[in-house]
Amino acid sequence: DCIKKFREYILENELATVDALDKIEAEAKAHVKKEKEAAWSDFSGEIKKELNEAVALIKSAAQDSTRKVVLDQLADELKKTINPIRKDVVSTVRKALLLLRFDSNSGKNELKAWYEKQTELNHDRYSSHLYSQSEWSVLKIDEVPAEFNEKSAVVDGREVLQAFFDNKLENDPRFFAFGEDVGKIGDVNQAFAGLQAKHGEWRVSDTSIRECTIIGQGIGAALRGLRPIAEIQYLDYLLYGLQMLSDDLASLQYRTKGGQKAPLIVRTRGHRLEGVWHAGSPMGMILSTLRGMVVCVPRDMTQAAGMYNTLLKSDEPAIVVECLNGYRLKERLPENIGEFTVPLGKPEILREGKDLTIVTYGSMCRIVMDAAQELSEIGIEVEVIDVQTLLPFDVHGIIGESVKKTNRVIFADEDVPGGASAFMLQQVIEGQKVFRYLDSDPQTLPAKAHRPAYSSDGDYFSKPSIEDVVEKVYSIMNEVNPKTYPAL
């Protein structure tokens, strides 16, 4: 007990008398007790006021109800509650509204209006600010299209990112990046190649192999107003920093009701390539544990750069999962590399179609687009949609409108069955209420449940292939019109 030891130290060194210390302790206890009682009075007084309002409204609604006896009992029991909490009040009101379901009177309407107002207040008390509600929310950042002209260079995808990072390091003194192999060699895929030599070790730096400390450094820097990019070398390694991301970063804005911000950007790479430890796509894990963070899943490096621009204008933490197999693919370099933005929460329709909608993201976009071309050659036109971000997810209902048009939908990705594909299905079928527009069962096309096997063969047999997409779509169309699309 440090207080006891401190008292002993004071007495041993004759810094005060026993009587003086006893007086200080007594005064301190009295002060704490008084403040505790005042705090409890303030807290409980508001709840008791709500309780009295609820009791009066239930009694009023009961006057003209066939369930008057039961409603009066509910109100009386609530009135007798010792040290009530809000759950007691709201739970009783909800029971009363159920009893009043067959009634129609002003008392019931007043009780219902009171409950709806309390629902809004309690959402603000207990559920608000999971994401930013400020003017710098990612949903409020204006879209600035990428600009190209006939002279726009065609470069490797990693060079698009290199140009973007160079621009930010040049123009924003708050911006810096760090992670395993980010500094001297310019990251494992060379998006930072040469940038440490140009901008210095303080701006582009290496770290030890310790994901949790990378995340911790990033959170601290972001809290102090800097704009760090903390790199986790591969998406599979995110597990080592997941606890800190979930407990300390994703929940920060919620825990403080927007009072604290740590707009850390976690950069990583994943999805298909080769290898059990380097080609994972555990997006369902991320969706379940990192609510409160933005989750970007760009299909190429140009989209990734635009998302970084958007995030750097916002006050929200995010994770950006770049496509591991896309760094050497050719892309056009935007003329406004440091300014263009990609709107988050807004899917993009990559190909229009009338027969079926395929919803996907990341590396699967190229697979699905190739499959769509093959399907077109046999008379099946699919609409391909890139969700672009999983959190936030399609805030404008673009996917739902597509499904209303095609009446069929497949959700495809590289996560395990029941992972992110199931999340997307729930968001669209339930969240956007399109079930009644479906003419065929909604389906998912995920990867296998195991880790991706090694080699190109392992990739082919572990992850959805072009043939898998074609056959999945064809099987649905066979069900629709077996004469035109006979069974394979």
Where are these regions (language model features)?
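Thiamine diphosphate
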Residues: 1-321, 324-488
